[in-house]
From Swiss-Prot:
Bias-annotated ranges (Acidic residues): 111-144, 228-248, 273-322
Role played: Component of the 60-80S U3 small nucleolar ribonucleoprotein (U3 snoRNP). Required for the early cleavages during pre-18S ribosomal RNA processing. Part of the small subunit (SSU) processome, first precursor of the small eukaryotic ribosomal subunit. During the assembly of the SSU processome in the nucleolus, many ribosome biogenesis factors, an RNA chaperone and ribosomal proteins associate with the nascent pre-rRNA and work in concert to generate RNA folding, modifications, rearrangements and cleavage as well as targeted degradation of pre-ribosomal RNA by the RNA exosome.
Biased composition (Basic and acidic residues): 145-163, 215-227, 352-365, 560-576, 630-640, 662-681
Protein name listed in UniProt: U3 small nucleolar ribonucleoprotein protein MPP10
Localization per Swiss-Prot or TrEMBL: Nucleus, Nucleolus; Chromosome
Assigned keywords, A-Z: Acetylation, Chromosome, Coiled coil, Isopeptide bond, Nucleus, Phosphoprotein, Ribonucleoprotein, Ribosome biogenesis, rRNA processing, Ubl conjugation
N6-acetyllysine sites (modified residues): 609
Residues recorded with modification Phosphoserine: 61, 120, 140, 164, 168, 172, 244, 247, 277, 346
An individual GO BP term: ribosomal small subunit biogenesis
Gene that encodes it: Mphosph10
InterPro entries with a match to the protein in the record: Mpp10 (IPR012173)
Record PTM: Phosphorylated in M (mitotic) phase.
Amino acid sequence: MAPRVFRRQTLERCLREIRKATNRPECFLTIQNGLASNFTSLTKVLYDFNKVLENGRISGSPLQKLEINSFDDEQIWQQLELQNEPVLQYFQNAVSETVEDEDISLLPECEDEECEEDASEVEADNQENLETDLDEEQLSDEGGDVPKGRDRAKSSRKSDPRKSPVFSDEDSDLDFDIGKLEQQTKMQIKPPGKPREKSVVDDKFFKLSEMESFLEKVEKEEEKRPDGEEEDEEDIDLFEDIDSDESEGGLFGRQKIKSNKSSRNLKYKDFFDPVESDEDITGVDEELGPDEEKEEEEGFAEEADESISDTDEDNDLEEDENSDQHKGSLKRVTFALPDDEAEDTSPLAVKQESDEVKSSFEKRQEKMNEKIASLEKELLDKKPWQLQGEVTAQKRPENSLLEETLHFDHAVRMAPVITEETTLHLEDIIKQRIRDQAWDDVERKEKPKEDAYEYKKRLTLDHEKSKLSLAEIYEQEYLKLNQQKTEEEDNPEHVEIQKMMDSLFLKLDALSNFHFIPKPPVPEIKVVSNLPAITMEEVAPVSVSDAALLAPEEIKEKNKAGDLKTAAEKTATDKKRERRKKKYQKRLKIKEKEKRKKLLEKNNPDQSKSSRAAASEKLKQLTKTGKVSLLKDERKDKPLKSSQAFFSKLQDQVKMQINDAKQPEKIKKKKQDISVHKLKL
């Protein structure tokens, strides 16, 4: 009994906690951290409890305990999924096997009112059994004996033949809707219907294709039947009087099996097959309405009760009336075709409905086309001013720049972070200044900057050669220096006298004239706004360095030769200019070399003479050996003044060429002719 008591206590404790939480639903409007921790602990208790009672047939999660310490909600859910998935699969397989088995019937056949009475008695007995079990468990825990009267009551209940099969404690908790289970099995067994063409007569309830298939099925069944059965059916006398028991059993036997469910729970689905499309179902519900459905259900329930309770004669009459009413209700439900104005059953309307049924590819294409159209529209529409590049104040709306977050470069160094070291350093400086009694403000020490010269006041360099001599240039520079000194050394007394005279003349002018003559206008100093365009709009921050406000030409000098170009960018003129520049530099180098030689000759004249003599001797030796030939200047390059001189010169050149061609032949002959005197015997 201990494990049963343990089970009951754990389940009661869990239910108590859940009831406490659900009694106050308004608490769930805010975050309940304590409640969340309680629920996690409850899930752990239930999980561990389930693992203890788990049979070997159902193998759930391999984890014997639910781990919740240092685990988040997602990880706990994953542990529960590991346990639930195989269990659900097991139950699904078991249910499908029982549904497929034709020998098993979910609803046992009962006879008339006895079945209902038995069912109510069984429920009452089950409740009494549960109460007695609870009392026995409590007594067994306390150590007391169970009374014998209760045992007898138990045995009498067990021996009751009308009682339904006994269920265990675990089975008693199961409560499921049989009607839903039947519908699920029908939907599973029902094969997927092939899409058929709609006819003109088709309605929400009536379909021509279904009628044709039903007739074909009936014909096939009739063909399969043997001849003996047909004769037996023909021999039955339909006008015979039938006993009340037989009539009740025969007429309402089938109805009892189906109407074993409570008549209050009967719905449209219990009388008619479900409509294939969801739209048709919703249409039927809307047409009937909740009031009509209730009336029909009550009508059917009343018919069933009256048919069971009344006599045979009354039964016959009521059967006729009920059949008429039933037929009328069926006619009203099944054949209540809509008006021609409400729904158009023409072939054009059917075609439109068939066109509406599109394939997945067509739907994808439609979505793609819509997306392309929207993107094209975005591209063609006018873009906002933020995406239009450089926009001036006139082109954008007023005060629109204030609503945007602008990104710009800070040229000023950020202030240092104040730490303990900086504060201590400041304290030391303050103490030192108090000792030195230096109460004046500290002069800011700045790094000396080279002021960027103004671009507009830049001196233009003159590339022409100066016509003045060096002496004249020095003279002008000297005169300028002397003039500056004389200007600086003005007599201070003269300056004072000039000021006094100016003030006197002003007073005299005021006395001599009717009205006061103002002071003469002093020439104002004009400030040239040589700044970038961004400062004119007053968008730039106040603390920006001067370097950021100057143009690049003001900061760095422009190259004299212009912008740098690559070899591919250079034109013919640029290449010629470079060539001239190289030649000029080469000439300068040669001139410098000659100057150095001359200086050396001047400094060492003896060395230069000896070098010249050595060079001349070397030349003579080379000419003697025949390695070098000296060219004499015979004034050949002198211009010819007459035609006679020209032709004579031409003749001489031809003769020289002929002689040069004959010389190698003579040398060969000399080498070949060997005299006898040179040979020794």
